[in-house]
């Protein structure tokens, strides 16, 4: 472990970008496994495209963006953490979401490379604000700067799994499924007294 940390400190760009790109590709494989039947093969061409977008753009963008924002608002003081998170969501998030949708549309050879972006940007952005505000608050508060891109890569693994899922589906279908899932989750988490309240009264 000590050797890995030393290597990361000596070669932060190589380590962080490699980890980030690999996690991007892995996220697509997980998404395919979860959404396909067990007999359907993995589309490794699609995985390669996701990994390419992650490695060429997202990994490099986040590496240099995190260094820039740390120099602009140094340290982990609460006010600076708030500034970093706000800048990240207002400036970086729209860029990375746009790059994901348009980049994959270009690699897929779609005629209208902005179609997915126009349809899914706002739902994706609003969901991302809820997730990434938490991820980045932790990142800027307690994660050492030299491993921040790798940490964001782990968070991006979860986020990219979601992005790959909704990219290949109608946004209304995804929204409907989420809305149906919420009552089911709530029902499973109901407290005993809530369940008792739903029982018919004894005659």
UniProtKB/Swiss-Prot annotation:
One Pfam family from the record: Mpv17_PMP22
Residue ranges annotated as Lumenal topological domain: 31-49, 108-143
Identification of the protein by name: Mpv17-like protein
GO cellular-component term (any): peroxisomal membrane
Coiled-coil regions listed: none
PANTHER family hit by this protein: PEROXISOMAL MEMBRANE PROTEIN 2, PXMP2 MPV17, SI:CH211-120K19.1
GO biological process terms held by the UniProt record: mitochondrial ribosome assembly
Topology Cytoplasmic: residue spans: 1-12, 70-89, 167-203
Key word Transmembrane helix present: yes
Gene behind this protein: mpv17l
Transmembrane feature ranges: 13-30, 50-69, 90-107, 144-166
Its job: Participates in reactive oxygen species metabolism by up- or down-regulation of the genes of antioxidant enzymes. Protective against the mitochondrial apoptotic cascade.
Top-level division of the source organism's lineage: Eukaryota
Cell compartment(s), UniProt: Peroxisome membrane
UniProt membrane topology term: Multi-pass membrane protein
Alphabetic keyword roster: Membrane, Peroxisome, Transmembrane, Transmembrane helix
Chief subcellular location: membrane
Similarity field: Belongs to the peroxisomal membrane protein PXMP2/4 family.
């Amino acid at each position: 472990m000590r050797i890995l940390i030393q290597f990361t400190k000596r070669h932060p760009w190589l380590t962080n970008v490699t980890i980030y790109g690999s996690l991007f590709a892995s996220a697509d494989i997980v998404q395919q496994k979860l959404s396909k039947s067990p007999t359907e093969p993995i589309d490794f061409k699609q995985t390669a495209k996701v990994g390419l977008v992650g490695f060429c753009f997202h990994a490099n963008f986040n590496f240099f963006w995190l260094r820039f924002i740390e120099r602009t608002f140094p340290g982990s003081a609460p006010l600076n953490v708030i500034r970093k998170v706000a800048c990240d969501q207002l400036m970086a998030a729209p860029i990375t979401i746009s790059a994901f949708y348009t980049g994959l549309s270009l690699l897929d050879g779609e005629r209208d490379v902005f179609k997915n972006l126009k349809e899914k940007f706002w739902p994706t952005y609003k969901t991302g604000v809820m997730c990434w505000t938490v991820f980045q608050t932790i990142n800027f508060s307690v994660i050492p700067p030299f491993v921040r891109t790798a940490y964001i890569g782990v968070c991006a693994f979860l986020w990219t799994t979601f992005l790959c899922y909704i990219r290949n589906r109608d946004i209304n279908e995804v929204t409907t499924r989420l809305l149906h899932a919420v009552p089911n989750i709530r029902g499973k988490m109901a407290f005993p007294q809530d369940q008792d309240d739903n029982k018919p009264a004894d005659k």
